[in-house]
């Protein structure tokens, strides 16, 4: 399949190409389109399915920080690396609710809770289920990321009212072994299958800028797009380099390459929420605007994402206003009268 010969109207169809048909070469052909052509195509696809002026706001809270036994080379929460991050116990329910109310007041529609576990223990899952019920009662969509799930655990989360489960693939199968050794790619796919079988929505994306090649970035997007069905929510993270982790000092990704990744994700997963996630704190307003043009329609709001910095809510509000955009659920700003 030579992507450049396929009409935009065909690429935009949810079932075209068929599930499992996306190969890295197909996605790479999109990456290698001229930049303006790629953005034009992505914007066309985006407008077929979404209001291009609306952005979904999500909030992310670390409910259990640090001490993770995994060796993910990018992660400051790994117990394998000395990053100066102290391990905490599971956050009390009332503290979670306080953070959820603050996120809702800031315009967030979805509240995500993350715990630095390899896999949740049964008694921890009971506590997280209570958090889900309480946050859901506020009227927020709920999402959790707790590591690998065993049989029956996704069903327990579903019964508690969970909307989304996040479990990222991180990178392509080919590059994966360079980043993580303590869990396999198949482990991740198995958890995603359990989430789907339980009837939960899937939030699944990855990280770019870890030293991977463009082909390996294409491999990640192809893998995501070939999930059947592809994820409803696709967070794209730009590596945040943390001193003490093996990836500290990695050469930064070209900003235009990050925009290309957003555009390609939009084209091959036309109905997904493509979310700007970690790494946004160092992005200029111009770069973020290009990402919106490329089809990003969700972002994490709030000062901190798990353990890394993030733009302040007020800065996000000002940016959306300058671009004539608005948060989903909020009324668009009225146009200002021009002076006579």
Curated annotation (Swiss-Prot):
The keyword Cell membrane does not apply. The keyword 4Fe-4S applies. Pfam families: BATS, Radical_SAM. It catalyses: (4R,5S)-dethiobiotin + (sulfur carrier)-SH + 2 reduced [2Fe-2S]-[ferredoxin] + 2 S-adenosyl-L-methionine = (sulfur carrier)-H + biotin + 2 5'-deoxyadenosine + 2 L-methionine + 2 oxidized [2Fe-2S]-[ferredoxin]. [4Fe-4S] cluster binds at residues 68, 72, 75. Keywords: 2Fe-2S, 4Fe-4S, Biotin biosynthesis, Iron, Iron-sulfur, Metal-binding, S-adenosyl-L-methionine, Transferase. Its EC number is 2.8.1.6. InterPro entries: Aldolase_TIM, BATS_dom, Biotin_synth/BioAB, Biotin_synthase, Elp3/MiaA/NifB-like_rSAM, rSAM. Catalyzes the conversion of dethiobiotin (DTB) to biotin by the insertion of a sulfur atom into dethiobiotin via a radical-based mechanism. Belongs to the radical SAM superfamily. Biotin synthase family. This is Biotin synthase. The lineage of its organism: Bacteria, Pseudomonadati, Pseudomonadota, Betaproteobacteria, Burkholderiales. The gene is bioB.
